[in-house]
Amino acid sequence: MTSPNQMLWSLIYRKLKGNRGNTMITVYEAERLTQIIRNKNNRTELNCENKMLSFDSNAQKIICADRRPNSYVGRKEEINLLPRLIAKYQAGNSFEAHLQAYITKNLGEGKNRSLDETILDGAEIEWLGNEVSCGVGMQRIDVMPSIMKNSQRAVVPIELKAVEADERNVIQIQRYVDWIEQYYIPNCQSDIQPVLITKKIEDKTTNNYRKLVNSFNRFNQTTNSRCNPLVFIEFSIIRNDLFFEKVTY
């Protein structure tokens, strides 16, 4: 290993956080892990139908265990996030976690046309992650799909805010771009398409809004050769549904 970008950062961040559960790994991390395992097993394909995969600590390789996989017997009913999200929105309560879950669940599924059009614009999702760790300081990208359009790949770091946008959001997005450029792009060549999604600003004539737009333009100028211009998307509630709109600034 000659460079930090060769490390499997998703697994390292998982250990640093000390959490248990599902941890998403990127496409290139999955491919690399698969090849490492394949090499360790002398490129022998394992036929483990109706058996469980296990690890032989003595031989230091993956084996087929003579026992059947466990069946999941927990809750299976679908959870409808939208009513909870709308209730919190109307009550003025925090709902960023619900917004993140809604986008992660529905993006690219054809269930919210405005969501798909503003973020994907006809592209296909090849990978989708949320709470993507991107630094030893425990920073995490809210949602990050990798998409394909016209044979061109783009990685889309999305910053979500359940409130109106402000200038500080650009600082966070800049950190995402820095990390992706240093650790993700060397392993998976892609365009970088930063996106900011926030609650709709009704009055766009204020001095604060002008400052916000100026911060977007400064970001675009300083990162012109590194990523695509920032896409600014606002959401609102229309007829008991979430509506997303791309803002021209």
Spans of model-derived segments:
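Structured alpha/beta reader/binder surfaces that contact nucleic acids or chromatin modification marks
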Residues: 1-8, 184
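Charged, terminal alpha-helix-loop-beta segments
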Residues: 12-249
